[in-house]
């Protein structure tokens, strides 16, 4: 092979050299090796059975390139293949019954779509430039070689195309380059495609030892010419439609296509110099690679597929640009039910699997809501062809993580598109039916861990979620993503167990939940957390997850922060009025919402990860900003406040003899959620200067006390009196309820501080504004001044330090290293007050 390549290079070089040294060229030409054939064009012409292909080359302007210059790879077909094509039903319907009836655009497509840059053997075509497996490659087909002019009758019938009822449009099925799909022996070996797979991909008799381009067999390969290589096909070289195009044009799939038409729209590709608009067809989809979540008017899509089935350069899970080469190694797969299968599913027959949907929506697919239709459609999409071939059917999972329940005898046909394979199947793979937010968890085979966790043997959460009088937003994590859970209890452990990571899994033998415990730093397994039955330790952690991932009440589009059932703050990421991701205070980045179901009592949203709580206590955060963190201080803005708390003994380790804080906690916090408004060092100094509180040195020296106040008190009692004044000041800066910038709007919402009014025996109030961008506080002192008609002021939180999330955790053992569960906890959101400010209660 190396020798052949060398002669090709020599041959090409000599051809170029002829322009400057004719006699030398002629001398070398006479010494060409016997195996080196003529140029590409002459070879085809001399065969005598490639008249159509030679004419194609001439008509498309490639005569000189194929005869004299260039470095070409060409897939060609003899005349017999053209004659077969002219007699085909598709060609007859389009009027292509002879060569002279082919439009120029069709000729360009026939030639350029089977041309590849540079001269390459089949073996070389199987490899990327970096030596990887090359399953798909682009062709020399120009995107605008053929642009269909579509009338309204042939457009998808939906609201996005209705504006074109009275006209026509130039509509590309996709605006990315076309690709060839190479079922070459080296490729199939690398991708572990079997003979059995090939039977369903390319038909009976197909073998991994043979070479195929799409579903066309290469009957003769590596034909060597002076200026390139030729590979002969057993049928005319026509790049197939993409998946969406095939489904649209295949009569047996018209019902499925009718539903899919709801979720596409024309998007402007470009405007020509003549002002003519060219559009491309886009499908609404939620993929990371090539998402299309809003329509051209900026509205949230009525429903979304997992990916765009029309994207020629389909690639799943990469950065998703048309120049990214991630498409080379794989393509998509779609399992599309035939019309007969759809009718059998969606039927008046009470035994039909889709009978309930049929009854609910009047027996018409047109009445089925967009979201349900989208759920049904995308349940038939898989991100990887390679991982969904028939040899994988026994373990095949859909993109929500549960079994596809597909068998080989369900396949009644297949079509290799340029961006994926379409399997025609004789059954519908339906969405899950449910009423409450836990319904999907009850029936979804991909949510077995959550299903068990909600049940009687673990957290008994099902009784709570059954309430139809409440509104829930339930964020559930699929089994395959029930991993990388940072165990909050393990922060109190030592050695390799400290800060453990849990990967939950199902023990199918005992129908219980286990967790592989890993070291966070190394990722190494350090054991399996289970008792062989129902583990109390796991129940504690699962309860924490369920509480963290359940919102009670309505959610408002645009509002970012919410407080969960377990008092944890979580952030929602919106795209218009749709939640596209969620983030716990302990997550480094948002967790994608990969599915959503609206139910009677709320919504169920699938996550591809576990929402984490903050790993830091309030003590830890104050210490970090007091120049005293063991891991290195961030700054010292909280130093004065931290020093006061520490001096007053407000940080405690063991609230009781049977439990302990992970590090330290504020002693007066209960199991609830709070806001802490921390005066900076200058704010504390201002309070001291205004005589509101004593300094620590004042307390030690018993300053700022009158004889009347301290009559009869000894020195320590005097200090304690001053210390209590400082404690009451500290406690007034911490209120019940977490106020978060970006959370629920407040307009002088009244909340209770942690400082008790000993006269009324009620806690002093704090009045708070929160408008999505700032928190402003009216303390009780200024509130009373306003009531009296006096001047007053509100205090803003700092734009520099705010929305800092903390969690004070108490575990069920006096020794944190022996803890197995969570005893109690509190959540806090910490804000620094603006420079020089503090809060007064009187």
Residue ranges of model-derived segments:
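Sec-dependent bacterial lipoprotein signal peptides
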Residues: 1-21
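Mature, structured domains of secreted/extracytosolic soluble proteins
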Residues: 21-842
